[in-house]
């Protein structure tokens, strides 16, 4: 029904996950190596010919029972749809890293000044209560740190529209404390704590918060923290 796009940027498990997706859905497309999350999604939208398109992140390990047969009615063609994902470090299950179904036209002209990509596309947002994948970001030190940093910067700064404050506090606490015994769990927690601090400090500074979408800046920040510690 809708185009499927796999978006990758230097993830160590990207090729493996891409090959698995391609084996199940041969018509899937790939956007690889585009700097900036928003720019990558804009390029993805420009490659699509359907009114909506699916986005699968490079670190997503799709569940066997998930398929791409969801159909959007005409009243929701401008709505961002997000499925749930399981976090392999702290076991949280919510929209972080989940498969997304995006409106093509609106994605092409999204507001790139906003730090949170999904809420910069449309004011209409729908959570689908189904787990689509495991977000296997904990494959190396940097990607684990980066994932914790980015998500906790967004949570702590309250930039995500319609955030539930109690839920946000619980998620922040889990990101910052749980998973020490999991692969690269310590790096994830270190990134989460640094991201929380960064988000709280810059909650009223959208320009500074937008840096969380710049992977080169994140890599520099990661190395700087490694040197400090």
Q: Residue ranges of each PLM-predicted region?
A:
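N-terminal anchoring/stem segment of glycosyltransferases
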Residues: 1-47
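Short acidic, S/G/P-rich loop/turn micro-motifs used as interaction or catalytic elements
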Residues: 9-13, 60-63, 88-90, 106-109
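Short His-Asn-centered micro-motif
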Residues: 7-8, 31-35, 56-57, 83-86, ...
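Hydrophobic beta-strand segments of well-ordered beta-sheets in folded domains
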Residues: 1-6, 26-29, 53, 78-82, ...
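Short beta-strand-to-loop acidic/aromatic patch adjacent to the donor-nucleotide binding site
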Residues: 51-63
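Catalytic-site signature of metal-activated, phosphate-bearing donor transferases
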Residues: 70-229
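Short, well-ordered loop/turn elements at secondary-structure boundaries
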Residues: 48-50, 96
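Short alpha-helix within the catalytic core of nucleotide-sugar-dependent glycosyltransferases
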Residues: 42, 50, 64-75
């Amino acid at each position: 029904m809708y185009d499927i796009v796999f978006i990758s940027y230097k993830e160590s498990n990207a090729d493996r996950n891409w090959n698995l997706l391609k084996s199940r859905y041969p018509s899937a497309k790939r956007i690889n190596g585009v700097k900036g999350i928003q720019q990558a999604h804009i390029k993805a939208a420009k490659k699509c010919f359907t009114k909506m398109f699916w986005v699968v992140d490079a670190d997503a390990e799709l569940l066997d029972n998930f398929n791409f047969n969801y159909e959007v009615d005409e009243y929701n063609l401008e709505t961002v749809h997000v499925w749930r994902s399981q976090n392999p470090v702290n076991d949280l299950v919510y929209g972080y890293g989940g498969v997304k179904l995006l409106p093509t036209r609106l994605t092409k002209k999204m507001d790139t000044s906003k730090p949170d990509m999904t809420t910069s596309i449309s004011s209409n947002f729908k959570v689908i209560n189904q787990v689509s994948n495991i977000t296997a970001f904990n494959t190396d030190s940097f990607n684990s740190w980066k994932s914790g940093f980015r998500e906790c910067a967004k949570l702590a700064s309250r930039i995500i529209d319609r955030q539930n404050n109690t839920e946000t506090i619980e998620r922040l606490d889990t990101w910052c404390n749980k998973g020490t015994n999991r692969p690269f769990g310590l790096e994830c927690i270190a990134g989460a704590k640094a991201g929380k601090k960064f988000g709280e400090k810059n909650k009223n500074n959208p320009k500074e918060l937008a840096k969380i979408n710049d992977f080169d800046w994140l890599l520099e920040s990661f190395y700087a923290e490694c040197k400090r510690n």
